[in-house]
Amino acid sequence: MKKNILITKLQKTIMYAFLLMTMLLVCTCTVYAPSTDSPSPPAEIPGLTYDHSMELSYAQEFSVDYYNDGYALITIDQEGQFLVVPEGKEAPEGLDKDITVIQQPLNNIYLVATSAMDLFRAIDGIDSIRLSGTKESGWYIQEAKDAMETGNMIYAGKYNAPDYELILNEGCGLAIESTMIHHNPEVQEKLEQFGIPVMVERSSYESHPLGRTEWMKLYAVLLGKEDVAEKAFKEQTDKLDKVLASDDIDTGKTVAFFYINSVGAVNVRKNNDYVSKMIELAGGKYVPEDTGESDNALSTMNMQMEEFYAKAKDADYIIYNSTIDGELNTIDELLAKSNLLADFKAVKNGNVWCTGKNLFQETTELGTMIEDIHTILTTEDDSLEELNYMHKLK
C-alpha cells in the first residue's frame, strides 16, 4: 500500500513537471515567434467601394487606400486619416468624424514642414503652395526662393506663431505641419476651428532613407500627380540599386559625419539615424559607433572634442555637416574650429569633405546622396573635388 502511494506521488510529480515544461515551451515559442500580422484591412467608408492600395517600397509611416470615383484615404501613423475628395464630389454622408476631409483641387497650401517643400518640387507642385512657414532667406530650394521673391508664395508665420488673418484671407485649403506642432497643440486646434485641415507629416520618422523620399507619393495624392511621383521616386531607387549591386559595395571604410557647435562640442548623428544609414548603404561604416539609438525626437547628440578624438581620429573619411554653421572650403577653416582635428587620419590623408547647405532640405535626392558617399569611398581620382551634395576641402 505504502509503495503504491509513493508511485502515485512520483507519477503526479512527473506529470506536473511535464506540464510545467510544456507551458514554458509554449511561452517561449509565443515570445520569439516571428510576427505574422497582416496589413490592416481598408477602412469601410459609407457609399464608397474600396479599389486598391498604393504600393510602397520603403515608407512605413503612411498608407493610401483608393476607392471608387477617385476618392483616396490617407492614413498617417499616430496622426490620423484624411479623405481626399475629388473636384466636383462631396464627402460621403456618415463619414467617421475622426476622418479629416481634404477637398480637391487643393490650392493655397500653408507649408510649415520644411522637409516637404522639396517633395512638392519633385512632383511639380510648388505652385499649390501659397503660404510658407519659412522666410525666403531660410530656403535653399531655388524654386521656393523664386516663388517667394515673385510673391507667388508668401511668409505666413512659423509653426508656433502663424498669421491666422493672412492664412484665412488667402483661402488656405490645407496646413502641412511637422511634429513640432505638438509642442503648441493650441495652434493646430485654432487652425481646425477656422475650418483648415491640418496634416502632420512624419517623414523624419522613417527608418530607411528612401522611406523619407517616398513621402512624395503622399503629396502626389493630394495634387493628383501620382504618375509624376512614381517616376521621380524610381530615379532615386535606381541609384540606390546601382550602388548596392556594385562590386565595391563593401568598402570597409569608416566615415565620421559631424559639425562643431558654437561652444566647441561635436554634434554627431546617432547610430540608426538616416545619415548613418546612408553611409552604411553607400558601403561605409559610421563612426563613432556607440552614439546610441535614435528616438526620432532627437537623432543627434553632442560630445566633447576629446571624446570624439578618441573615438573617431582613425576614421578614413570626414564629412563635415555645414547645415548649421555654414560651408567650409579649406582644411584650415576646419582646423580653426579645433586644432585636434589635425591629428585625424582623414585630415592627414586629405579625405575631408563638406556638405552643401541644401543637404537636409532636399529630401527627394537621398538616392543621389548615397551615390555621392559611395563615390567618395571608392574613387581613385585624386582630382575629384565636387559632387552633387559634397565638395572636398583643399
Language model features with spans:
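Bacterial N-terminal signal peptides that target proteins for export
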Residues: 4-17
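Bacterial Sec-exported substrate-binding components of ABC uptake systems
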Residues: 29-117, 228-257, 381-394
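Extracytoplasmic ligand-binding site segments that recognize negatively charged/polar headgroups
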Residues: 107, 115-117, 132-143, 183-186, ...
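Structured C-terminal subdomain patch of bacterial secreted/periplasmic proteins
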Residues: 206-235, 317-394
